[in-house]
Amino acid sequence: MKFLNPLILTAAFAMPALAAPVTYEVDKVHSSIVFNVRHLVSQAEGRFRDFAGSIKYDAQDVKQSSVEFTVQSASIFTDNEKRDAHLKSEDFFAVEKYPTLSFKSKRVVSRGENKLDVLGTMTIRGVSKEVMVPVTVLGVGAGPRGEVAGF
């Protein structure tokens, strides 16, 4: 479904341990799943407000890394109630029949310093397709509740 291309994933994750690889759980306060779609002669922007996910990240060997996300399809928000209702309908996400969207990585490849390609399976409306998501590693640092990483 071209509707989600390009999908922009921005996430910050709380670090549970210092050993590699490290699994980061989504911190929804500092994370977002947003999209930008061409509509007629303009762009429509939106986001999903309810999601969960994790990234297993190995900075020394990114091939050992993985990503998983689950998104509640009914949480779509474009700041237009009529459009949101249409997107939730059978015409698009059919949220009553398909309450979640998901992504599960198959492979993570380094594209150079702080750049990754994450190849995986995106499932929308029960249809699974291979997609590649470009990811930028923003860094790892100290946060108010311990170590955090940004992607």
Please give the residue ranges for each predicted region.
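Low-complexity, acidic/polar, glycine-enriched regions of mature
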Residues: 18-151
